[in-house]
Regions:
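Residue-level recognition of conserved beta-strand positions in structured domain cores
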Residues: 29, 55, 62-64, 88, ...
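Conserved hydrophobic/aromatic beta-strand scaffold that supports enzyme active sites
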Residues: 18, 27-29, 50, 67, ...
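A generic "binding-loop/recognition-motif" signal
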Residues: 23, 57, 66, 82, ...
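A short beta-strand-loop-beta hairpin characteristic of the jelly-roll/cupin
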Residues: 38, 44-45, 50-72
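Histidine-centered divalent metal-coordination motifs
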Residues: 43-44, 84
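Tight coil/turn sites that cap or link beta-strands
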Residues: 35-36, 72-73, 79-81
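A short, N-terminal "cap"/entry segment at the start of jelly-roll beta-barrel domains
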Residues: 1-42
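Ligand-binding loop in jelly-roll beta-barrel domains
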Residues: 81-103
């Protein structure tokens, strides 16, 4: 398998693919093609999430930290119960994320 297999050029929604799931740890590939999280609907998860931007670019807002622009190679830990949202993703190329969900 390859992280870049079957990347959509355009899609109505983000594509989530589970790559591995083991006792309390889940790794997934997320592919965005211009999507963002609606301003009034941030994520607030029960688990820590470590994300790596593999390709493309994106804006990520995290409660208490503000917004930051992410480029390939950038990574961040989003603590459990911290509101966050994707403010934008590249429209001209797929944005590929690697997300690791931790207890």
């Amino acid at each position: 398998m390859n992280l870049f297999d079957d990347l959509p050029c355009q899609a109505d929604e983000e594509l989530f693919t589970e790559l591995l799931s083991r006792r309390g740890v889940r790794i997934e590939r997320i592919v965005s093609t211009g999507q963002s999280t609606p301003a009034g609907e941030p994520y607030n998860q029960e688990f820590d999430e470590w994300v790596l931007l593999v390709s493309g670019s994106a804006g990520l807002w995290i409660e208490g930290d503000g917004e930051r622009e992410l480029h390939p190679g950038d990574y961040i830990l989003i603590p459990a119960h911290r509101s966050h949202r994707v403010t934008w993703t590249a429209k001209d190329e797929p944005t590929v994320w690697l997300a690791v969900h931790l207890p």
